[in-house]
Amino acid sequence: MDATLLLNVEGIKKTILHGGTGDLPNFITGARVTFHFRTMKCDEERTVIDDSKQVGHPMHIIIGNMFKLEVWEILLTSMRVSEVAEFWCDTIHTGVYPILSRSLRQMAEGKDPTEWHVHTCGLANMFAYHTLGYEDLDELQKEPQPLIFIIELLQVEAPSQYQRETWNLNNQEKMQAVPILHGEGNRLFKLGRYEEASNKYQEAIVCLRNLQTKEKPWEVQWLKLEKMINTLILNYCQCLLKKEEYYEVLEHTSDILRHHPGIVKAYYVRARAHAEVWNEAEAKADLEKVLELEPSMRKAVQRELRLLENRLEEKREEERLRCRNMLG
């Protein structure tokens, strides 16, 4: 059936291939919609561009969350659960599809750790590319054309029925999520689950970074958020130390100290990372700085210096043995 009149949107035609069940779902703002889709050209062969079933994962979008391909929200909100429909969409609705497709393909290839959901922030950077890395998508980008979408609506969940990801929270919810994520990260760290703990800290950092972009740099609220971010980054670095990712620790701690040279914990954590990669002078310099800024940490510093000396002695002994074996 021609759904242009039903949808009241120019450049869309709908044909129902399989009827859905029940009434039209309540597509309220924040609802999560799960569906399979196949995208095809309007040529004689109906060339398939993308197919979520081939990837093995359905797609998710959040209603009202500025999804980049806005037409999909229009299409989905015309459907019932279990309905399968074919939509012909004119060029005015499909110009951005190549950029969306690129992101989805990269996810399917394991280049992005997230699931099949894409939001505006993730797509904005795509405009910087001259090529999308896929010939068929480059052609579509150069010469936009009408596309056919076959969509199967699987599920519609109200905001209270699923765990919302942090990028999908509003500002107040992000702020409320931070101490929860921080506490969960601490709990997981104590249990020795360092990978999971680092993920929680990262999530909290992303929330705060997002909030910080809305503040004027170096003003009171910005600095308050910056302090919280640095605390979380240093917790994240503690996880990296446990995972033996020492060079990343050096990168993060040095970045903090470039902007905030008085943070004692940053020197201490960086000293431990330097020690692990045999940067003796740098480790000792950082530990001296810790003592200068926080004399009460003398015992901890002395312990780290002993550990460093023991490790250096072990290394020197290994080198002596290696030389003997080479000469022997």
From Swiss-Prot:
Q: Tell me the organism.
A: Bos taurus
Q: Residue ranges of the PPIase FKBP-type domain?
A: 53-145
The gene behind this protein is AIPL1
Task: Give the source's domain of life in one word.
Answer: Eukaryota
Protein purpose: May be important in protein trafficking and/or protein folding and stabilization.
Name this polypeptide is given: Aryl-hydrocarbon-interacting protein-like 1
Q: List locations, semicolon-separated.
A: Cytoplasm; Nucleus
**UniProt cross-references to PROSITE patterns, sorted A to Z:** TPR_REGION (PS50293)
Q: Between which residues do disulfide bridges form?
A: none
What does the subunit comment say?
Answer: Directly interacts with NUB1.
